[in-house]
Design a protein with these regions (language model features):
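Solvent-exposed beta-strand sheet faces enriched in polar/charged residues
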Residues: 7, 36, 64-66
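Amphipathic alpha-helical interaction surfaces in cytosolic regulatory modules
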Residues: 14-34, 41-59, 73-75
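C-terminal structural segments of small proteins and small subunits
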Residues: 52-86
């Protein structure tokens, strides 16, 4: 299992477009991916749950990845937030 903390840097937070792209990215991996913030958790492959987190700019997301391709999933998710979470 891997765990990574990522700060939301988008001024609009994790709104519909980047959340949808994140969920699509999570679907590319067989690993289980859980995203949590402020005591709430969401399955990374479920758009409704991810949006319900209400992650705003400055919030820290804890992302837990567990499965056979967890290293690749971790790298892809870090890259997503570094380059394209807008």
């Amino acid at each position: 299992m891997r765990s990574v903390e990522i700060k939301v840097n988008n001024i609009e937070g994790l709104h519909a477009r980047p959340a949808s792209r994140l969920v699509g990215l999570c679907h590319q991996f067989g690993s289980s991916i859980t995203i949590s913030t402020h005591g709430a958790a969401a399955v990374g492959k479920n758009i409704t749950e991810v949006l319900s987190l209400g992650a705003e700019m400055g919030n820290t997301l804890t992302i837990k990845i567990d499965g056979i391709d967890e290293a690749r999933a971790e790298k892809a998710i870090k890259d997503f937030f570094r380059t394209g979470a807008e």
